[in-house]
Amino acid sequence: MCLQNLLSILCFVLAISFGYVSAQKCVDSMFFRPNGTYDTNRHLILSNLASNVSSRDGYYNGSVGEGPDRIYALGLCIPGTDPKVCDDCMQIASTGILQNCPNQTDSYDWRSQKTLCFVRYSNSSFFNKMDLEPTMVIGDLNSGLFQGDLAAYTRTWEEFMNSMITRVGRTRYLADISPRIGSARIYALMQCIRGISSMECETCIRDNVRMYQSCCNGFIGGTIRKPVCFFRWDGSEYLGAFGDTPSLPPPSPDGKTISTGAIVAVVVSVVIFVVLLALVLVIRKRRQSYKTLKPKTDDDMTSPQSLQFDFMTLEAATDKFSRNNKLGKGGFGEVYKGMLPNETEVAVKRLSSNSGQGTQEFKNEVVIVAKLQHKNLVRLLGFCLERDEQILVYEFVPNKSLNYFLFGNKQKHLLDPTKKSQLDWKRRYNIIGGITRGLLYLHQDSRLTIIHRDIKASNILLDADMNPKIADFGMARNFRVDQTEDNTRRVVGTFGYMPPEYVTHGQFSTKSDVYSFGVLILEIVCGKKNSSFYKIDDSGGNLVTHVWRLWNNDSPLDLIDPAIEESCDNDKVIRCIHIGLLCVQETPVDRPEMSTIFQMLTNSSITLPVPRPPGFFFRNRSNLDPLTYGSELGQSSSKSIPYTIDSASITRVTPR
């Protein structure tokens, strides 16, 4: 027994000693080149992490850079921390990681410095990832072993910790005080990062508790830290985490219970507090009700005050929504150029009153876009819900849409050769790459898995440098982390860009966006709309069929837009056509993920698989059976045979 205790003490002291040498955990599995792009990005994101965390209620995650030089970082402070104290703690933790982990691609630190804060960075996204290793055990050398009835202490310790474990998952944070053990108490704090589930939080904390029981049983204080959770226990208060926790009175010497008067006083105080709290909440709700939509489901919008614009400001910015400021028609409404009082140019999207499902699309767009931050996505600046108006305010993107440059002015039926000539092969290739990065962010790197469901040329805006920005999230759907596909009774989007499983069965997933992106790649290469190919040959009339024929005839270069013939790289063009055909394969499982597409575009040494036949491939118009074809598109057999997917009609939704 003595030997076992001695080994436990030795184990704990060694762990503590190591912990005091370095509070940071530098993961030594991968390294980066000092002073390179990754190192620059690391300094950039960590130097701004403290201000981002302290200004965002104590929690922030984000990324900087592209490709292999991209770095992800997360920071948090425990709830209720003063912003200045949080900022100081984050500064110390960030600086410590930079100094003590000179070239590791993954490091983390739980810092106890007046408060508890956490910093982690990595070369791969970890925001929703359950990481239980590596572990740090750090303790208080001065606390020592519990002096008293060790069996009673251990029993109380285990019961108390198990009780906390069952509660911590709901909020990811818990600080509590145990019942008395003689004159002693246990002060325990548990914290998980927000990205993991409640069950994962409980699992991580439980693993820390087991580690204490196996190596450090009986010690009064210490901490056990993992990349996604933190556990500390001690014999006295710390970090100001227990200031609001009421202290229980010591047991009465004569063993009598608390007096009736004391109980009545406590009950009356609690009742008064609850009544006052209810009154405050009712008054606040009434004051703010005119600014928010009445919630109907759990998915309805919750709107931060900083995003709200008043109607008069937007009316003045757009000169009362004058025709001269009209930029065009977007999904479910008209878009106007505006100038805010601070001289910021904006695009103001005014939802039309007869837009059918517009209200839901409006809320959908606000909820989703407000959470997204990526250079290849149009940034949402705010919204307005006054006077029965529903308005979205976006950053202004000066060069209109990709559709305008590739296919011309739809209203005037004109194609300006000077506009098309601005899209040389280098720019088109960069546009394909930018859209890839934007979709990769939506599908994989954002906090939610988001499916756009309406990827097409008119929803790709071009900034002043002709960089693409994905726009119009009215059709978008967000998925849980563990969800891979869904279905809908109402098929929405643009025909010609929809995959077969969506058109016929209403099933959609990230592979739906991949299919649409494949069609868009082929349009960018050839400079023609998908719907313009029904006159070219005897096929059923779409771009996918035309490209598949050229591919099988070993003549893919016949697809190239004459405007880029002299400037294009034939190898890259063929590779893009190949990737486009992989994206439009009939079976979703055959289509590559956006992460794979990104690798295919950036690494020419990757061998591409042979594409399978695409969806909506028609051999000859005369072979089409009206009944079969109509039913495949989800139409009544009484409908006439559509020659293009763009002209098909499944619902009364007007293609945008």
From Swiss-Prot:
It is a single-pass membrane protein. Its EC number is 2.7.11.-. Its main location: membrane. Residues 1-23 form the signal peptide. The modification Phosphotyrosine is found at Y394, Y502. Residues 24-262 are extracellular. The active site is at D454 (proton acceptor). Belongs to the protein kinase superfamily. Ser/Thr protein kinase family. CRK subfamily. This is Putative cysteine-rich receptor-like protein kinase 32. It comes from Arabidopsis thaliana. The gene is CRK32.
